[in-house]
Amino acid sequence: LKADRLYMENRIEIQNAVAHMVQRGKKHISFAGDKNHCQSFFERYMAYKDAVEHFGLTEGLSTCAMPSGQQNYPVSLYETIRRFKTMPDAFVCANDFVAMDLVKALNELGYSVPDDIWVCGFDDSQEASYFAPHLTSIHIHGQIMGYTAANLLMTRIEEPSLNYRTVYTETNLILREST
């Protein structure tokens, strides 16, 4: 597609979340979410994978909870983690809604977040700060993304012959109760 593109930066803060978990003793860190759902989920999975490989903690790769194409995702997620022989001690999730579904499934299985298992989401949705426990998440700066999108559009209108641009906006890890 010949067009300007705007994305949020998915990699750095996922890697920072994994580093935070490792620094606090977590060794079996897994990913939850359908990596094939969209490009952002795939980038987040790859950032997670690179981070755990960097720390030599590849055990978590064998227990990723990635049901795909499911109509009832919460049930599929529950069924996936219920079958784990060894439960991870932390999860990085594709977004906050996956993280909240995961916390509910873990609670149903008798695990406590964060006492037994840590969970980190992505998007810093409004629901993440109200959810119990308050969800650690990676904040997307929506206002900056909106401004940047408008700027890209206005520049394209004024200078249609410019090379197409790909712009990434910054994200930030927000630590809350779930880690």
Segments predicted by a language model, with ranges:
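Bacterial carbohydrate/catabolite-sensing allosteric modules
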Residues: 1-179
